[in-house]
Amino acid sequence: MDKLIITGGVRLDGEIRISGAKNSALPILAATLLADGPVTVQNLPHLHDITTMIELFGRMGIEPVIDEKLSVEIDPRTIKTLVAPYELVKTMRASILVLGPMVARFGEAEVALPGGCAIGSRPVDLHIRGLEAMGAIIDVEGGYIKAKAPEGGLRGANFFFDTVSVTGTENIMMAASLANGRSVLQNAAREPEVVDLANFLIAMGAKIHGAGTDTITIDGVKRLGPATYKVMPDRIETGTYLVAAAVTGGRVKVKDTDPTILEAVLLKLQEAGAEVTTGEDWIELNMHGKRPKAVNVRTAPYPAFPTDMQAQFISLNAIAEGTGAVIETIFENRFMHVYEMHRMGAQIQVEGNTAIVTGTEVLKGAPVMATDLRASASLVISALVAQGDTLIDRIYHIDRGYECIEEKLQMLGAKIRRVPG
């Protein structure tokens, strides 16, 4: 199992390119199953979950054609089986996204419940209830969701999401694209990745209005045709490198990104004392060697501050001037990284869903363990500014969401290397 060794104390300085968004690429790949001809998806990030989704298509009898730039062509007409097996989907919650497209396009689907995913405790039940509202007959047995469309296909429906669910919104929107009649999704997720998926579906011929608002209207069509589409840039990767620059007092320009989808994060970085300038597809952050000021953060659904940037801002507050409160309103158990940061000397107190962070001038390198994707990014950021060496274990979590993280940080001057376990 690989590890990262980081020697802190270097101010980041330079330019990097941002990868395509994983959370956009996965639903877009799932949506290719709706097409009745070949579809090309460009700007895919080189990540484990993307590879798993492409491997899943291979198991179904589809033979994706991938080029060296990680553009993939998929022709779903060659599909031979409508089963997404457990051994593939157990590591990837996004596998549930093939459920809606398969039922809508082929009339049935059998998808293993993603690993550790209990019905009711996570919003898988919203996916099921949404499809049932469209007439699908669904059984959950033996760890699989087995779904069939009614005779004549799925029917348009009005559906209200009890809680805002990004993947739930995406799944039902995809299914509704080929349903008979009109569907209206209320309390829908407004994330940019939902809009990106809607734009891809529209490129294939779907009739969708209101993506990016909490009410999405879909008029079902008879067929969706071939298309070529470029995945949007990753806003969380963008934010992570900007925070890394801020924490080290450095200057970073991130290219091939979109400042308009990151406004809540950019405002907080400016509040922390960063000079932020933007262009159409780039953002530059410059701390001019200064130590950041602590900021208060409260996570909430888009367009508010994203939960996936919460851990990175705890790292920022840990070395900032003053005290900042970070309130997590989206997920439980999202402060696992705090206990690893204590090993580096961070002064953080957790009270319920709030982390109160008192900045300290110095963090010390230590052996730490990544616990999940975004928590692992916060440990990397803290290590960049810590005195001495930090050894980060279980970095497969990082590899799930960050393409070539050590190479990109090396381009910015960081002393970081990957070592085999």
From Swiss-Prot:
Sites of 2-(S-cysteinyl)pyruvic acid O-phosphothioketal modification: C117
One cellular-component annotation, GO: cytoplasm
Gene: murA
Residues that hold phosphoenolpyruvate according to the record: K22, N23
GO molecular function annotations of the record: UDP-N-acetylglucosamine 1-carboxyvinyltransferase activity
SUPFAM superfamilies to which the protein is assigned, alphabetical: EPT/RTPC-like
Species of origin: Pseudomonas savastanoi pv. phaseolicola (strain 1448A / Race 6)
Entry protein name: UDP-N-acetylglucosamine 1-carboxyvinyltransferase
Function: Cell wall formation. Adds enolpyruvyl to UDP-N-acetylglucosamine.
Entry's family note: Belongs to the EPSP synthase family. MurA subfamily.
InterPro entries: Enolpyruvate_Tfrase_dom (IPR001986), Enolpyruvate_Tfrase_sf (IPR036968), MurA_subfamily (IPR050068), RNA3'P_cycl/enolpyr_Trfase_a/b (IPR013792), UDP_GlcNAc_COvinyl_MurA (IPR005750)
Pathway stated in the Swiss-Prot or TrEMBL entry: Cell wall biogenesis; peptidoglycan biosynthesis
Enzyme class, first EC level, given as a word: transferase
Protein localization: Cytoplasm
EC number: 2.5.1.7
Active site, renumbered: C117
Chain sites annotated for binding UDP-N-acetyl-alpha-D-glucosamine: R93, R122, P123, V124, D125, L126, D308, I330
Disulfide bond residue pairs: none
Pfam families: EPSP_synthase
Swiss-Prot/TrEMBL catalytic activity: phosphoenolpyruvate + UDP-N-acetyl-alpha-D-glucosamine = UDP-N-acetyl-3-O-(1-carboxyvinyl)-alpha-D-glucosamine + phosphate
GO BP, sorted A to Z: cell division; cell wall organization; peptidoglycan biosynthetic process; regulation of cell shape; UDP-N-acetylgalactosamine biosynthetic process
Alphabetically ordered keywords of this record: Cell cycle, Cell division, Cell shape, Cell wall biogenesis/degradation, Cytoplasm, Peptidoglycan synthesis, Pyruvate, Transferase
Coiled-coil region(s): none
